[in-house]
């Protein structure tokens, strides 16, 4: 079996395992202010921010694979409370209104979790992924792909999202990265190496990304080798052209990546 390559370590991440839809604000389906396990209305979020602007510090746009694949502009429609790794005391004193929501709508489900750490820290996401968000913070955007989809289509997303667990995220999103990841060799490799869910292939980083042998120029973006510089620039130009054309086509046809 292919082995993970050191050059690829720490360059791909699964998004956050929020573990509780009660953390979210979403008007696209069932939502209310009381029922555990479902979102709150966005109007509730807006009211809480108006009452205490500091609440905006821990509410983030939330995006998953469906929005990335279905929206022509990868538009999100959800928001999520994210206290990071803050203590319960800090969250209660700093954001009492939001903590009340999480206690009412998330805690009951989390207390039933078999993993003790998830019930003990019920006000935090199930997996907060600090390495992912630290890596993304250094760049303007990140490359992402829906983990489970018949067609693998990579795209750029802003860095201010909370990424759902159904997204695989690659910090340092540049057009040369996009060109390599969207290329036929990589897509065929991922389909062959990856796992599956029902009839859809699953992009599993440990199987699809970590063992993949990327072009030398791609691995050394600060190269001073003229041949590698030329190859990297070609990848950058091709990736930019393809991504821009695809983005314009999706908007003009009002179609998503896989619709």
For the regions a language model picked out, list residue spans one by one:
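S-adenosyl-L-methionine
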Residues: 1-259
């Amino acid at each position: 079996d292919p082995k993970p390559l050191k050059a690829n370590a720490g360059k791909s991440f699964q998004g956050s395992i929020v573990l509780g839809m009660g953390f979210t604000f979403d008007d696209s389906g069932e939502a209310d202010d009381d029922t555990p396990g479902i979102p709150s209305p966005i109007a509730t979020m807006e009211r809480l921010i108006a009452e205490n602007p500091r609440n905006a510090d821990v509410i983030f746009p939330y995006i998953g694979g469906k929005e990335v694949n279905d929206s022509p502009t990868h538009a999100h429609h959800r928001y999520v409370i994210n206290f990071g790794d803050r203590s319960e005391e800090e969250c209660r004193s700093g954001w009492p209104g939001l903590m009340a929501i999480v206690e009412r709508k998330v805690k009951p489900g989390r207390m039933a979790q078999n993993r003790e750490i998830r019930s003990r820290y019920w006000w935090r996401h199930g997996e907060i992924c600090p390495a992912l968000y630290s890596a993304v913070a250094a760049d303007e955007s990140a490359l992402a792909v829906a983990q489970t989809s018949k067609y693998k289509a990579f795209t750029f997303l802003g860095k201010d999202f909370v990424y759902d667990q159904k997204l695989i995220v690659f910090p340092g999103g540049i057009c040369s990265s996009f060109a390599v990841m969207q290329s036929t060799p990589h897509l065929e490799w991922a389909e062959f190496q990856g796992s599956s869910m029902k009839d859809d292939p699953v992009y599993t980083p440990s199987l699809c990304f970590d063992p993949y042998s990327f072009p030398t120029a791609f691995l050394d973006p600060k190269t001073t080798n003229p041949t590698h510089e030329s190859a990297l620039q070609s990848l950058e130009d091709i990736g930019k052209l393809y991504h821009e054309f695809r983005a314009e086509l999706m908007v003009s046809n009002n179609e998503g990546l896989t619709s």
